[in-house]
Amino acid sequence: MGCVTTPQQDPRPLVRAAADRARRIVENVGPDHMTAPTPCPEFDVRTLLGHLASTLERSAAVGSGGDPRTIPESLTAADDEWPALLDRSIEHYWQVWNDDALLYKPVTAPWGTFPGRIAVLVELDELIVHGWDLAVATGQEAEADPPLAEAALEVMRLALPASPRDGLPFGPPVEPAPGAGATERLANWLGRDTAPWVRRERT
């Protein structure tokens, strides 16, 4: 996978890798995990699975000129159907965002109007960070492959300033813990307090 280093470049290869990673995490979520808490206090595992699929559908709506607010914040599925639901949402996402020209066209989301590639970067964040959320909530490996996580972190630092973030769906950055991996540092940059969810070796 090539390393994307600026928000002006095509971020879709990163999104494809992040979607593949999210799919692997979802595949390993079992029925006994569904009511477990997650780092997103408004979601348990079941509703976070539904929210992850919803982010893809909402991004597809943004890219196609629709209103993402018509899509529920969290989709629903039977406990054994989450991988299939995510597959359908990923397929729908790419039906819209495979259009190269869309990266440079203005699109409108609830938080503003901007070039399409910015909407792709937002989905990259959703996939990697909510993948991290699901992984730590279900006892899976939470760190993405370093090339993916480092590239995504570099892009998001360029695309999303530390401040101001008024009107954006991100909180202020959180100071990373010493030794935090790139995926955790990405979550921190996007406002996630990861400390309660990560066990660290005492020295």
Q: What would you call each of these model-derived segments?
A:
Residues 51-52:
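Glycine-rich loop at the start of a catalytic domain that most often binds anionic cofactors/ligands
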Residues 2-21, 28-41, 57, 61-203:
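Structured surface interface patches that mediate subunit assembly and partner/cofactor docking
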Residues 48:
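Extended, alpha-helix-rich binding/interface surfaces that flank or overlap catalytic cores
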